[in-house]
């Protein structure tokens, strides 16, 4: 006969081992990434080393998001979603700027392509997946129409100001802003994003908290938050991982462009690759929240990432353009504008009721599939 309590102790031991393995992995990856960065900086690695560096880069991205999640858990919702969104945006800006520095005039549309891809991935891919998971879990996914509608309206306004208007201004020929117009778009984007942060975290915080099937607000999590020491440690490792991502992205940038060319894809696919790489960990986090019946948290992550991608990336690129050579084309093409317009229209119809079924999730995923197909075959 087994000793009393032996079966009860086994799950706890397994859980402890899993936690230790996760802790070791998340602590070691940022350190290893910095070592790899120091050893490979300024070199032109061969193909096998490029693959290794790429794997380390992906690990650094995953590690950064993991530590951002720990910090986010410490500060609670909806602040946590903001921490994740800003961390992901820092990685995105780093990848864009490093590729633009190395690519010159050939990367004039890289910022536009990446930001638009991030908007399509989050507003269609991530939202569609999370609505699907939420509806499968509870037949009907519920969320706050007020908070989600505010976020969607902000994303639509930011996208129009930064990605659509450049096609219709007259100061510059082509889909470009003049320096003054670019400065206005950057300031307006920052102001809108800052206002949304205030609304989400202070003025109407309850609009962004998860809700139950009957509309009751869920203002607490079952898991105990990390200690202040754990949160500070994760903050330090997060900064370390972000530095590693910036440096490794610069080393990997020629390989990314060569891979896109070898696959016969258009140059705009580079932006899609960057957005997919950067948003993959956050997509997993949003899907996990949806499976835990926290669809509102998933929507906060998705729309918050889209908003940060436009509202923070465009100002950062505007500042970086002072030192970058070549033009900065932000205006979308006709096909992309159509996709953006239908995404906003479908998003409004999805958000207004505050409830969504499998059908709404399927519609968003169909739009995401159309975006991917047209990105590969314009």
What are these regions (language model features)?
Residues 2-378:
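Hydrophobic alpha-helical segments, chiefly the membrane-spanning helices
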């Amino acid at each position: 006969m087994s000793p009393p309590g032996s079966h009860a102790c086994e799950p706890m031991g397994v859980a402890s081992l899993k936690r230790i393995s996760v802790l070791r992995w998340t602590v070691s990856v940022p350190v290893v990434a910095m070592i790899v960065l120091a050893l490979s900086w300024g070199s032109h690695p061969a193909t096998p080393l490029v693959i290794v560096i790429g794997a380390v880069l992906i690990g650094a991205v995953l590690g950064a998001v993991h530590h951002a999640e720990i910090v986010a858990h410490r500060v609670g919702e909806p602040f946590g979603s903001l921490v994740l969104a800003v961390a992901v945006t820092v990685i995105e800006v780093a990848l864009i700027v490093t590729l633009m520095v190395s690519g010159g005039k050939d990367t004039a549309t890289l910022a536009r392509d990446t930001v638009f891809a991030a908007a399509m991935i989050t507003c269609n891919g991530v939202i569609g997946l999370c609505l699907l998971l939420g509806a499968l879990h509870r037949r009907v996914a519920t969320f706050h129409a007020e908070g989600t509608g505010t976020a969607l309206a902000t994303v639509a306004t930011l996208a129009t100001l930064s990605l659509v208007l450049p096609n219709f201004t007259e100061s510059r020929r082509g889909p470009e802003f003049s320096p003054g117009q670019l400065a206005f778009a950057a300031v307006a984007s920052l102001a809108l994003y800052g206002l949304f942060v205030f609304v989400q975290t202070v003025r109407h915080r309850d609009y962004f908290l998860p809700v139950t099937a009957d509309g009751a607000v869920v203002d607490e999590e079952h898991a105990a938050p990390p200690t202040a020491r754990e949160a500070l440690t994760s903050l330090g490792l997060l900064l370390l991982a972000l530095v590693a991502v910036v440096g490794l992205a610069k080393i990997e940038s020629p390989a990314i462009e060569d891979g896109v060319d070898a696959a016969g894809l258009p140059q705009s696919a580079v932006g899609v690759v960057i957005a997919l790489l950067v948003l993959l960990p956050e997509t997993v986090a949003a899907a996990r929240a949806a499976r835990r019946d926290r669809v509102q948290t998933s929507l906060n992550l998705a729309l918050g990432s889209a908003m940060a991608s436009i509202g923070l990336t465009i100002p950062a690129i505007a500042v970086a353009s002072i030192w970058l050579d070549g033009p900065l084309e932000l205006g979308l093409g006709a096909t992309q504008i159509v996709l953006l317009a239908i995404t906003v229209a479908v998003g409004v119809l999805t958000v207004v009721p505050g409830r969504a079924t499998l059908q709404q999730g399927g519609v968003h995923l169909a739009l995401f599939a159309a975006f991917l197909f047209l990105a590969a075959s314009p």
